[in-house]
Amino acid sequence: MTSLPSSIFQGGLGDQPQSGLVPKVVEQTTRGERAYDIFSRLLKERIVFIGTPINDQIANLTVAQLLYLESEGSSQPINIYINSPGGVIYSGLGVYDTMQYVEAPISTTCVGLAASMGSVLLAGGEDGQRACLPNSRVMMHQPMGGTEGQASDIEIQAKEMAWLKKRLYQILSFHTGKDIDQIEEDADRNHWLSAEEAQEYGLVDQVMNEGNLDALKSIHANGEASDADSDEE
C-alpha cells in the first residue's frame, strides 16, 4: 500500500502499473476514414471502462464521460465495465454519486476484478443490470488510511474514517439488501467472492454465461448497425 497524504483514505490492493499506450481504431465510413482512440470508440457505444486503481484523475475522467453521455439525452443504458483493485474513497464516491445522478440506467459488469471501492461501484449499478463475467473476483473490506500530527488532528481523522466506513456500509446495504451489521462483519477483513458468490450476496444480479454473452454481443451489434445507418445519412 502506498503512503498517502494524512487526510486521504483509500481502500484497494495497492498500486498497479499503468501504460501510456492507447490503441487506435480506424473505421471506414462513407465519408472516409475515422480514427479513434479505443476509449473514445467505446464511449461512442455508451461504454465506460474503469481498468485502473481509482484516483482523482480516473474519477474525473469517468465522471466527465458519464456527464457527456447524460447530456446527449438518450435513455439508452450506459455500460460501465470494471477491472479495478479499488482506490481513493473520495474519488470513488464521486463516481458513485454521478452514477446515481444520471437519468440513463447504468449497467455495471466486472471483468476480472472489482475490489474495495470497485465492488461499491459494481453494486451501484441499476437493479437487474449488474453482472460478473464467470471468472471474475469481487472483494469487500473496510477502508484503510493513516494520519499523523497532534492528538486532536488524529482524533479528527479517526472520526472521518469512521464516517466513511459507515457510509460505505450503508451504500452496500442499500444495494445488496444485507443488514449493515452483516456487511460490517463480512468486510472486517478482505472478503473474497467468486462471481456466483457475488450474485448470491446481492452485489450483482447475474453471472454472464455463454447464452447471455451472446445476447450482449447482439445488443452491441445492433448499436453498430444504427451508427452505420447514421453515417450514411
Swiss-Prot record:
Its EC number is 3.4.21.92. The keyword Cytoplasm applies. Cleaves peptides in various proteins in a process that requires ATP hydrolysis. Has a chymotrypsin-like activity. Plays a major role in the degradation of misfolded proteins. This is ATP-dependent Clp protease proteolytic subunit 1. Pfam families: CLP_protease (PF00574). GO terms for molecular function: ATP-dependent peptidase activity; ATPase binding; serine-type endopeptidase activity. It is found in: Cytoplasm. GO terms for cellular component: cytoplasm; endopeptidase Clp complex. Belongs to the peptidase S14 family. It catalyses: Hydrolysis of proteins to small peptides in the presence of ATP and magnesium. alpha-casein is the usual test substrate. In the absence of ATP, only oligopeptides shorter than five residues are hydrolyzed (such as succinyl-Leu-Tyr-|-NHMec, and Leu-Tyr-Leu-|-Tyr-Trp, in which cleavage of the -Tyr-|-Leu- and -Tyr-|-Trp bonds also occurs). It comes from the Bacteria. Fourteen ClpP subunits assemble into 2 heptameric rings which stack back to back to give a disk-like structure with a central cavity, resembling the structure of eukaryotic proteasomes. GO terms for biological process: protein quality control for misfolded or incompletely synthesized proteins. The gene is clpP1. Keywords: Cytoplasm, Hydrolase, Protease, Serine protease. The active site is at residues 116, 141.
